[in-house]
Amino acid sequence: MSDLKTESQDLQQEENTLIALRKEKLAAEREKGQAFPNDFRRDSYCNDLQKQYVDKTKEELEAAAIPVKVAGRIMLNRGSFMVIQDMTGRIQVYVNRKTLPEETLAAVKTWDLGDIIAAEGTLARSGKGDLYVEMTNVRLLTKSLRPLPDKHHGLTDTEQRYRQRYVDLMVNEETRHTFRVRSQVISHIRKFLIDRDFLEVETPMLQTIPGGAAAKPFETHHNALDMAMFLRIAPELYLKRLVVGGFEKVFEINRNFRNEGVSTRHNPEFTMLEFYQAYADYRDNMDLTEELFRELAQLVLGSTDVPYGDKVFHFGEPFVRLSVFDSILKYNPELTAADLQDVDRARDIAKKAGAKVLGHEGLGKLQVMIFEELVEHKLEQPHFITEYPFEVSPLARRNDDNPAVTDRFELFIGGREIANAYSELNDAEDQAERFLAQVAEKDAGDDEAMHYDADFVRALEYGMPPTAGEGIGIDRLVMLLTNSPSIRDVILFPHMRPQA
C-alpha cells in the first residue's frame, strides 16, 4: 500500500513540475503580446481532408498545391511532424525547417502536447502514403498548462474518465464515437417522429405535483412563491393535457430526475423520449417501436443485429410479445397458474424471490414483484411484456376482456427495461379513483406511489380522445447501440460523489 502511495506522490510531483514549466512558457507568451489570440479562421477539418483527398497521389497533390487552414490540439510530436486533432479526427502537419522563419521554428520547439495551434499550408503526401499539411505558417492559439495522460497508458481509470470527461474526450476515440452516436440517435428519433406528424413540445421541469411515474422526486423550494416544488420525474401528465387541448401527436426529449439509487443502469438525471398519439392504442406503439429500433440499429451499426457484451440482440426479428402472467409461467415452469392467482401463495413466492413485501399488496402488485425478481433478468432478446395489472398502472386503460389488467407493455432487451407504454386512461372518474388508491398506497408506506393531481383529472373531464403513449430511455438505448456496459459511459457528465 505504501509503495502505491509513494508512486502516486511521485507522479503528482512530476505533474506539478511539468505544470510549472508550462506556466513559465505561458508567461513568456504573455510578454510577447496576446497569449490567447482569436483571429484565426480555419477553412478545413482534419478528417474531411483525409476523406476528400484519399485518392490523390503524392504527385497530384504537389502539382495542385491545395491551400488549407487547419487548427487543433497537438496529440503527437515527432520533431518535423506533429499530429493535430480537431472535432473530426487527425492530420499531420510538417515543420519544414527550410521554409519556416527562424522565429517560428524557435517557437515550435517550446510547444507541448495538448497545445492548440493554427496551421496554414498546402496538402502533400508522405512516402508512406500519409496525408499532411506542409506548413507555410503556424502559431500557438492556446497554451495547455496540464499535460495529457501518458500516451502509452492513456486515461484508463474509469472514475477519472467520468470526472474529467473533457480529458477522456481528448484522448479516447471510443468515447468520442459513443457521444457522436448518441447525438445521431436523438437526431434520428426526432426526424422519425416529425416525419410522422408529431409535434415537438416542452413541458415544465419544475412541478408543484410530481406525477407521470412511480418514483421518488427531488424536492426544492421556490423562494418568491414560498412553496415546495419538485424536479419532474416524468412529463406524462402535461403531455396528455396537450392531447386534451388538441395537439393530437406530441413528443418531448428531455431530462427526468429521480431521487433514487445509482447503478450501471440508473443515474438520478437521465434523458427520456415520451410521445403520445391520439386514435391509437398500445399495439400501435409496439409496431412503431419495432420500426424505430430497427432503423436506429441500421443507422448506427449498418445491421439489425446488435452486439452487446458476449450477446447479439436481433432487432430484425419480430419482438416477442408475452403477458406478465404468461412470462412468469414460461420462465418458471415450477410455478402454476393457481400459484399466481392465490394472493397468499403469490405473497410467499414474492418473499422467497427476494421482493420487499410490505403485506398490504394486492394480487396484481405481487405478480409484478414476482416478475421483476424471477423473469426480468432473463429477457435477453427483445420482449414486449404486456397486460400489467391495473394496481401498478394507475395511468393506463383497463383491458376490455380482462379489467384486472391494462393495455400496457414494457420493452425489455438484455434484461433491462428500455420502454414503457400503454393505451392511456381517458376516463376521468376512473382516473380519480386510481389516484385515490395511489394516495392510500403512499400513506401505507410506498414512497413511489403517485400524488393526487386534481388539475389533470379536470383536464380529462373536458375529454381526451383514445390515446397511446410511450416513454423510451435514451441512455439505455444508447448503451445498447454502443455496447456500453454502464449508463455513465453514455452520459457526458454523470453524477459522482465529490472527491475527498
Swiss-Prot record:
Its main location: cytoplasm. SUPFAM superfamilies: Class II aaRS and biotin synthetases (SSF55681), Nucleic acid-binding proteins (SSF50249). One of its GO terms (molecular function) is tRNA binding. Mg(2+) 1 binds at E410, E417. Its EC number is 6.1.1.6. InterPro entries: Aa-tRNA-synt_II, aa-tRNA-synth_II, aa-tRNA-synth_II/BPL/LPL, Lys-tRNA-ligase_II, Lys-tRNA-ligase_II_N, Lys-tRNA-synth_II_C, NA-bd_OB-fold, NA-bd_OB_tRNA. It comes from the Bacteria. CDD domains: LysRS_core, LysRS_N. Gene3D superfamilies: Bira Bifunctional Protein, Domain 2, Nucleic acid-binding proteins. Binds 3 Mg(2+) ions per subunit. It is an enzyme of class 6 (ligase). It is found in: Cytoplasm. Belongs to the class-II aminoacyl-tRNA synthetase family. This is Lysine--tRNA ligase.
